[in-house]
Structures are given as C-alpha cells and as structure tokens.
Amino acid sequence: MLKDLVREKLLTIMNTKAYTQFNPEQLLQLENEMKIYMKSGDSALTEGNYFFLMEMLFYVLVYRNQDVDAQVVYNTLRDRLGENSYKMVIMKATLLQINGNDKGAIEYLENLLNDDLEYETDFVTYVSIAKKLIAIKTTSKNLSQESVLKEVVALTDKFPLDAELWWYASEIYFEMGQFEKACYCLEQVLCITPFNYACFGRLSETLYYEALRSKKQTKTELLEKALKNALRSVELSELYLKGWALVNIISRELGRNKQNDLIKLSASKLKEISAKSNNKDKITAELILNKI
C-alpha cells in the first residue's frame, strides 16, 4: 500500500511537472524520496513509468547542480533506450549546456534539425528539439529578443497547436510592451487549452496593462475585458491568488468603491488564501491585502 501511494505521488509530480516549481529544499527531499523508492523494487512499477521517473530524477539532479549524478542517470537511460529518442537528445543537450558548452549544445541540436529531420520525424520530436534549441540560445544570449521571437513565430506557423509556443511568444511580446500581440497569443493558448486558469489570469493581466496606456473609452472596454478574464480564472481555480488580486485591482481601476461586491469578495478570498495556502502565496496575499 505504501509503495502504491509513493508511486502515484511521484508519477503525479512527473506528469504535472510540479518539480519545475520546487524550491531547493523541496528538490532535495524529492531526490531522496525518489532514490529510496527506485531501490525499493516496486513490482507494480511498469517499465514505461520507470523511465518517466528516471527522466524526472535526471532533471531534479540538474536543478540541484549534481552534474555527475545526472550524467550517471543519462548513461543508464542511454544504455536501455539508445540515443535517438527526442527525450534523450534533449537530455544530452542539457548535459552539454550545464557543463558550459552552450555552443556544442546548439550545434548538436542544429545538426539534428535539418530538412530531413523536419519531414521524416513526428511532430513531438521536431518541436521538442526546436524548443530546446531556442531555450539554449536564449539563456546563452546567442540570439537577440527579436531573433528569438522570429524563430518562435516561425514555429507557431508550422505547429499552430502547440500551446507552449504561443505562451512563449506572448511572454516575449509582453516584455517588448506589445500587449495586443501578447493577448492574441494567449487567446491561441486558450483555444488549445480552454480550462487553463493561469492563462486566463495572464490574459487579464496583459489586458490590464494595455488598458493603462489607452485612451479613456478604450481603457474602460479593455478593463472590462480584463475583469471578465480574471473572473474566469478564479471560476476555474477558486483559490487562484493572481486571479483574485486582479479582480480587486481592476475593479478599483474601474472606479468601484470598497463596498462593491467584487471588491469585497476578492478581499475575502485573498484573506482565505493567506490563511490556507502555501507560504509563498500566504506572504504574497498578505502583501496585497496590506496595499488594498
């Protein structure tokens, strides 16, 4: 029974990619828990799930700067799976990257992303490798922001159903202050993932910033639209901190007083979040409450 619970917990963390948001202490705890579990000999662990968990262990070790241990995990998987799957390709590029060889990682991936690979491989393989290449170029400052955006937009033309590409494009447009284009990209994300509460929150935030620099009539229209998206985000996730903060801020920007139902409700929800949520959300909620 205990092994069943641990297995399901670890697989859930892997499938949701929750570990990518863990702090150093949580990563260390996860690493130790995984190593103990993997040595426990769980007969109910399928081969496929074994590889999934080993993949997560690899990235946990990378995040913790355990380069040697990460290499050992990679070697274990390579001996079992070979080097040709896109996940192994991305792992190899990651190892090159963390060992300070960004140029080698870029050349390795670019050599794979030739015309033959584009047309001979499946969608997941090509787009996954292409996204990894862009990520390395971005962190290594190999490309300007405009060049990165050009590559991402080119990929959205080829793979319009990849929500992550549209999200990445929206983030770049947002940083460049091109809020209208950022909103368009976020709307594409919602067409693909219609229950993505975080995306509704980000769209609301982007519309809010666009409204702040717009003329009065347009500003009100944009704020109303931003409020609608913020409300949708908290409809999908009742204790979504960012969503309730936006509901409060946008309602105030629209000129509503403290007795307004939405302002009272959002303040109440922020208090609930400060009492119930994780430490990070608690602190953030309390800071917001102090300002309102």
UniProtKB/Swiss-Prot annotation:
Gene3D superfamilies: Tetratricopeptide repeat domain
Alphabetic keyword roster: Endoplasmic reticulum, Membrane, TPR repeat
Source organism superkingdom: Eukaryota
Compartments reported by the entry: Endoplasmic reticulum membrane
Endoplasmic reticulum found in the keyword field: yes
Placement of TPR repeats on the sequence: 163-196
GO biological process, one term: protein insertion into ER membrane by stop-transfer membrane-anchor sequence
Membrane topology: Peripheral membrane protein
GO cellular component, one term: endoplasmic reticulum
Function: Part of the endoplasmic reticulum membrane protein complex (EMC) that enables the energy-independent insertion into endoplasmic reticulum membranes of newly synthesized membrane proteins. Preferentially accommodates proteins with transmembrane domains that are weakly hydrophobic or contain destabilizing features such as charged and aromatic residues. Involved in the cotranslational insertion of multi-pass membrane proteins in which stop-transfer membrane-anchor sequences become ER membrane spanning helices.
Family: Belongs to the EMC2 family.
Record-linked PANTHER family: TETRATRICOPEPTIDE REPEAT PROTEIN
Miscellaneous field: Present with 5740 molecules/cell in log phase SD medium.
Subunit structure, interactors included: Component of the ER membrane protein complex (EMC), which is composed of EMC1, EMC2, EMC3, EMC4, EMC5 and EMC6.
Name recorded for this polypeptide: ER membrane protein complex subunit 2
Species in which this protein is naturally found: Saccharomyces cerevisiae (strain ATCC 204508 / S288c) (Baker's yeast)
Species classification: Eukaryota, Fungi, Dikarya, Ascomycota, Saccharomycotina
Gene name of the encoded protein: EMC2
